[in-house]
């Protein structure tokens, strides 16, 4: 579990599920992402940026990047998965690993 700064974000990873809780002007937004690619993944927070009312989180594991975009005004969440080229790995990028529970 990892807590991030402004706006308040909480990420929790269990098995193949990632739960995201974000405090927005509309209140608390909670959403769950399930993917078989998350099952044995050791997720790393690669970046967190707030741009034009959107919070962008980039998480990674191995050759996969998980791009999460939260629209703070509406609480809408977008989740995308991207595969890195075979020569790249998230392990070589700076960031903080999430702990599994």
From Swiss-Prot:
Gene coding for it: N
Protein family membership: Belongs to the orthobunyavirus NS-S protein family.
Top-level taxon: Viruses
Protein name: Non-structural protein NS-S
A biological process from GO: viral process
């Amino acid at each position: 579990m990892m807590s991030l700064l402004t706006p308040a974000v909480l990420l929790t990873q269990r098995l193949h599920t990632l739960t995201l809780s974000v405090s927005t002007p509309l209140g608390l937004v909670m959403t769950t992402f399930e993917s078989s690619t998350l099952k044995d993944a050791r997720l790393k927070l690669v970046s967190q940026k707030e741009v034009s009312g959107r919070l962008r989180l980039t998480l990674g594991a191995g050759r996969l990047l998980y791009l999460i975009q939260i629209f703070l005004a509406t609480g809408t969440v977008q989740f995308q998965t991207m595969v890195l080229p075979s020569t790249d790995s998230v392990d070589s990028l700076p960031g903080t690993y999430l702990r599994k529970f």
